[in-house]
């Protein structure tokens, strides 16, 4: 049984988001023994219980108030939302934050030898998908009639098996499509992982802890997006150097022993530092340029 003051989080047991969800909780300091054969895991150091479930069960568990939080792909969330709206079922939730993983897109794909010029080429064809409601919404907006073929997996084999003329499925790199003789022709929906929360009554103890967890999640994501930069620069070129680096705050400037014309500069950069930027810094006279990852960050 769950204790009333423990926060219940639903996340994918196995699959695309599982490892990244675990890594996020671990980076937030949650000590939890996650075993794949168990459906429920309990944190050792925080009031958190994790339910390990199928990804398409997560939105419903949150909307029905079974769990407090859920980590789920926006594509799965939107599909469940559209399904529940069509059934006039409970579908309330709050999106607390879009996360920095689980990036993909739901796309239409055709066999490579099929001619495609625009969206009207899809009229009246049979399309295999695991996301019938997202597909219907998209094609209805384009006034495209079609026949749906619902599949829960291995959607990409449908054209070869004679089940459908096209597919609508998740794409990350496109390698799976290519391996099955398909090509992407139209993006239907862009998706990230997100953290959602149930609506309704959440007691003050849970609310306080969820706010604390959100602060940690924000810090973890901010740290991943940032780099700690250290370098030496000529005083005369200092402002030019700073203008190349987009920092969270103004840099720390330190004197260099035995050199009155140069200073050491430390700063947190909120953007990826590319080789081109480092080469520009070098041309401005910067030296000893170090770019370091940040493990944790709190503003």
Curated annotation (Swiss-Prot):
PANTHER family for this protein: ATP PHOSPHORIBOSYLTRANSFERASE, ATP PHOSPHORIBOSYLTRANSFERASE ATP-PRTASE
Tree of life domain: Bacteria
Keywords noted in UniProt: Amino-acid biosynthesis, ATP-binding, Cytoplasm, Glycosyltransferase, Histidine biosynthesis, Magnesium, Metal-binding, Nucleotide-binding, Transferase
Tagged with keyword RNA-binding: no
Regulation: Feedback inhibited by histidine.
Function: Catalyzes the condensation of ATP and 5-phosphoribose 1-diphosphate to form N'-(5'-phosphoribosyl)-ATP (PR-ATP). Has a crucial role in the pathway because the rate of histidine biosynthesis seems to be controlled primarily by regulation of HisG enzymatic activity.
UniProt cross-references to InterPro entries, sorted A to Z: ATP-PRT_HisG_long, ATP_PRibTrfase_cat, ATP_PRibTrfase_CS, ATP_PRibTrfase_HisG, HisG_C, N-reg_PII-like_a/b, N-reg_PII/ATP_PRibTrfase_C
Pfam family, one: HisG_C
One example of a Gene Ontology biological process annotation: L-histidine biosynthetic process
Cofactor(s) demanded: Mg(2+)
Entry protein name: ATP phosphoribosyltransferase
């Amino acid at each position: 049984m769950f204790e009333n003051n423990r926060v219940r989080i639903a996340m994918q047991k196995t699959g695309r988001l599982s490892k990244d969800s675990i890594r996020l909780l671990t980076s937030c300091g949650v000590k939890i023994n996650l075993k794949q054969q168990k459906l429920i895991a309990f944190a050792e150091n925080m009031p958190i219980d994790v339910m390990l479930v199928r990804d398409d069960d997560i939105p419903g568990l949150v909307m029905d108030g079974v769990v407090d939080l859920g980590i789920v792909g926006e594509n799965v969330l939107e599909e469940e939302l559209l399904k529940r709206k069509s059934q006039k079922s409970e579908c309330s939730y709050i999106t607390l934050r879009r996360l920095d993983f689980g990036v993909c897109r739901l796309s239409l794909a055709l066999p490579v030898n099929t001619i495609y010029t625009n969206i009207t080429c899809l009229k009246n064809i049979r399309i295999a998908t695991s996301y019938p409601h997202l597909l219907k919404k998209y094609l209805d907006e384009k006034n495209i009639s079609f026949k749906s073929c619902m599949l829960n997996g291995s959607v990409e084999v449908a054209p070869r098996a004679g089940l459908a003329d096209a597919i609508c499925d998740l794409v990350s790199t496109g390698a799976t499509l290519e391996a099955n003789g398909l090509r992407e022709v139209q993006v239907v929906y862009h998706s990230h992982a997100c953290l959602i929360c149930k609506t309704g009554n959440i007691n003050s103890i849970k609310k306080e802890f969820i706010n604390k967890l959100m602060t940690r999640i924000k810090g973890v994501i901010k740290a991943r997006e940032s780099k700690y930069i250290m370098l030496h620069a000529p005083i005369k070129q200092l402002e030019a150097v700073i203008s190349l680096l987009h920092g969270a705050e103004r840099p720390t400037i330190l004197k260099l022993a035995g050199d009155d014309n140069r200073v050491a500069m430390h700063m947190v950069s909120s953007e990826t530092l590319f080789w081109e930027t480092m080469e520009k810094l070098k041309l401005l006279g910067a030296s000893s340029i170090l770019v370091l990852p940040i493990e944790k960050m709190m503003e």
